[in-house]
Amino acid sequence: PENPLNVPEVETTTARLARHTGTVIHSALQAIVESKLVTNHECITADAFINQQHSFWKIQLQQLGWHGDNLTRALQKIAQSIRTSLGSEQGRWLLNSDHQQSACELSLMQKNKHDVSESIIDRTFVTEGIRWIVDYKSSEPESGETETAFIAREMETYKEQLLRYQKLLAATEPRPIKTALYLV
């Protein structure tokens, strides 16, 4: 085992802020899809959504213990992620609620030898006969890391997770399945 003494790992303030910010971003993207704010015929503007949700995000982060500069940075990251997502054709395609079998935070259970494990898929849908499985990531390149190196590192880090999701859904349907990371 990686941690045979079961010693708790100490999470840095930066890592904890990034994790909490990512959770709020996931919830915001889920709200966009489930509220049908992006469809084949219309799309909410990023500024309208940010203005509508900003106070809610602030309260969520404050309840998690964030204040001052950290709170400001987190809110800026969330707003930028929404602007990037709603401002790009790829982001609007991903968040389009008109896709067939559209779902967010899809929970799948898998029985193992001695227990049951849960996998939660951030975003999935079917378009043109293909099942898409998308995992959102709000991480950022390390200092001095090129964009190409960052993307390669993220793909390597999450490859097994995406393959597990693909295998779980492949057991339930015969259609082709594609997986993707969406870096917000």
Model-derived segments and spans:
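Short beta-strand-loop-alpha-helix junction that forms the active-site gateway
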Residues: 135-154
